[in-house]
């Protein structure tokens, strides 16, 4: 909750006001935020987060939220409509911002599992719904021994701001089961997943219009298919939209083409929007474009793999891969397809012959243009941020940078592209899959034939127009003088690129186009906000400001029921 205080502004000069308030409220964080004054106070319980070595994950998200509020609050007050005094507007804005902070619902579930060997154990899981300002809520389910109540709350909060950042109309949620999936058989994992689904359903924590899970760490299409099947055959057996209760499903279960690679492709598009901006590249001392760029990726799972593939295709060079059981380094480049094949065959990247194990202290400190943390949270801290040599950090993982490290990186002119934007490709394409399930038809099915015939009619029309013109007598004489040819047919053939698209966009084409557009539009909005508030390279605060303004508008326009 917020610790709100009423602050009277006395005196004629603004700088004197700020100085007085700063002395009176040393922990209130009354700051100018690069020239933009605010009264918003960061709660005392978060006062150590900006310098903490290992803050709680949820505290990190809360702190970034409050930092965004410091920038946005004054503008939100100015934009308030209605016959209210300024003090009344301030109180309303503070009230709505207060409403946006806490986690709305969180459930802890424990149930027994009878293992294949006959012994029993208890399984613990969580589901958090951070914000229901938009429904359904949306967020993945992860299977990991690191799952905790704090982590699930933090990830659900991050999902709220992530969805708002890229204009996906969902609230934020997250779930986790505290298990290591590698220690269970497929039969045991199916029993765990189906039982967890039933427990969520009984408590109203899953449903097409209520709460829609998705894959996350340790889960994939298989688990999502089990969830959809369990829900459809129990609680949702009369619901025609039952399979929209979860996304990331196999294609024949209502999944969508392009979902598996969506997060990695989103990371690529997000990077592309900033790496081609000469203004940002000049600030960090590099040139625009992919040519000659090197990168290191931490984590070679689904996100890391597809990110590496798309960046390599664009012309960048992967020189290092960090995994939990080993690292690879090759300054000449690592082929992501060959490494993927090796990992699929051996279950690890260790032993891959086309790169050497890194012999230094930590590969993430190696010189490169782009560092991509795509594994777990809090890998860049105040203790190692000064050793990062990359010029760009793309947060493909959730929460990889602590607030203290974030400040160090910005002060060092390192461009941090924040998690709530850069890894939003997954939830964006999940939104497309959810819409597909509600519409009960795949994208493009109704238009494929029409688009193909329309394109051929267009080519025929161009050909007829040209032939009609050249058959004119005056044109014939001119053509005969210049080319020695009169009349005849002039075939109009499609170019190679047009020929590939002439039959109309496939579902994957539509998904890729929609994702590209979403990431581009969101990037422009972040840049615009960063410029508006003079935030420089602080893209994280700009992204949070955008999210806060959108969520605030939803609450403001909907009103409070009670």
UniProtKB/Swiss-Prot annotation:
It is an enzyme of class 1 (oxidoreductase). SMART domains: ELFV_dehydrog. The keyword ATP-binding applies. Its EC number is 1.4.1.3. GO terms for molecular function: ATP binding; glutamate dehydrogenase (NAD+) activity; glutamate dehydrogenase (NADP+) activity; GTP binding; identical protein binding. Gene3D superfamilies: 1.10.287.140, Leucine Dehydrogenase, chain A, domain 1, NAD(P)-binding Rossmann-like Domain. It holds the Pfam family ELFV_dehydrog_N. The active site is at 174. SUPFAM superfamilies: Aminoacid dehydrogenase-like, N-terminal domain (SSF53223), NAD(P)-binding Rossmann-fold domains (SSF51735). NAD(+) binds at residues 132-134, 167, 243, 436. The keyword Oxidoreductase applies. Residues 1-53 form a transit peptide. One of its GO terms (biological process) is glutamate metabolic process. ADP can occupy the NADH binding site and activate the enzyme. Homohexamer. This is Glutamate dehydrogenase, mitochondrial. It comes from Drosophila melanogaster. The lineage of its organism: Eukaryota, Metazoa, Ecdysozoa, Arthropoda, Hexapoda. The gene is Gdh.
């Amino acid at each position: 909750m917020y610790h709100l205080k009423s602050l009277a502004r006395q005196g004629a000069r603004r700088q004197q006001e700020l100085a007085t308030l700063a002395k009176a409220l040393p922990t209130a964080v009354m700051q100018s935020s690069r020239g933009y004054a605010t009264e918003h106070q960061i709660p005392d319980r978060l006062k150590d987060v900006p310098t903490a070595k290992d803050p709680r994950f949820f505290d990190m998200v809360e702190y970034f939220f409050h930092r965004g509020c410091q920038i946005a609050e004054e503008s939100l007050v100015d934009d308030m409509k209605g016959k209210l005094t300024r003090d009344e507007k301030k109180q309303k804005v503070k009230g709505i911002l207060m409403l946006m902070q806490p986690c709305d619902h969180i459930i802890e579930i424990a149930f027994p599992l009878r293992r294949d060997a006959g012994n029993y154990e208890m399984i613990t899981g969580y589901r958090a719904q951070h914000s229901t300002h938009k429904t359904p809520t949306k967020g993945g389910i992860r299977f990991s021994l690191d799952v905790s109540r704090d982590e699930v709350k933090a990830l659900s909060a991050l999902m709220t701001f992530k969805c708002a950042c890229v204009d996906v109309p969902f609230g934020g949620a997250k779930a986790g089961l505290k298990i290591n999936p590698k220690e269970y058989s497929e039969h045991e994992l199916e029993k765990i997943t189906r039982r967890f689904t039933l427990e969520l359903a009984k408590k109203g924590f899953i449903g097409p219009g209520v709460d829609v899970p998705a894959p996350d760490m340790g889960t994939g299409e298989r688990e999502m298919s089990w969830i959809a099947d369990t829900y459809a055959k129990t609680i949702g057996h009369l619901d025609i939209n039952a399979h929209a209760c979860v996304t990331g499903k196999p294609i024949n279960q209502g999944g969508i083409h392009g979902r598996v690679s969506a997060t990695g492709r989103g990371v690529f598009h997000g990077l592309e929007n900033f790496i081609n901006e000469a203004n940002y590249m000049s600030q960090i001392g590099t040139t625009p474009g992919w040519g000659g760029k090197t990168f290191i990726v931490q984590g070679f799972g689904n996100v890391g793999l597809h990110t590496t593939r798309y960046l390599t295709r664009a012309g960048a060079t992967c020189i290092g891969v960090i995994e939990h059981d080993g690292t690879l380094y090759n300054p000449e480049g690592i082929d992501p397809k060959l490494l993927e094949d090796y990992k699929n065959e051996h279950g690890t990247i260790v032993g891959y012959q086309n790169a050497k194990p890194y012999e230094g202290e930590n590969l993430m400190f190696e010189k490169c243009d782009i560092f991509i943390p795509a594994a777990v949270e809090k890998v860049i801290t105040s203790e190692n941020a000064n050793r990062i040599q990359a010029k760009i950090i793309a947060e493909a993982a959730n929460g990889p940078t602590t607030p203290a490290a974030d400040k160090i990186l910005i002060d060092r002119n390192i461009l941090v592209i924040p998690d709530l934007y850069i890894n939003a490709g997954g939830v964006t394409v999940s939104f497309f899959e959810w819409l597909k399930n509600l519409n009960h038809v795949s994208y493009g099915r109704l238009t494929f034939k029409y688009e193909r015939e329309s394109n051929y009619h267009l080519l025929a029309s161009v050909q007829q127009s040209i032939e009609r013109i050249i058959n004119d007598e005056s044109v014939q004489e001119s053509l005969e003088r210049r080319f020695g040819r009169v009349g005849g047919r002039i075939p109009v053939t499609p170019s190679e690129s047009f020929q590939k698209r002439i039959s109309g966009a496939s579902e994957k084409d539509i998904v890729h186009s929609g994702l590209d557009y979403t990431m581009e539009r969101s990037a422009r909005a972040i840049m615009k906000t960063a410029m508006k508030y003079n935030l420089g390279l602080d893209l994280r605060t700009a992204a949070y400001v955008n999210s806060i303004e959108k969520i605030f508008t939803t609450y403001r326009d909907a009103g409070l029921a009670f």
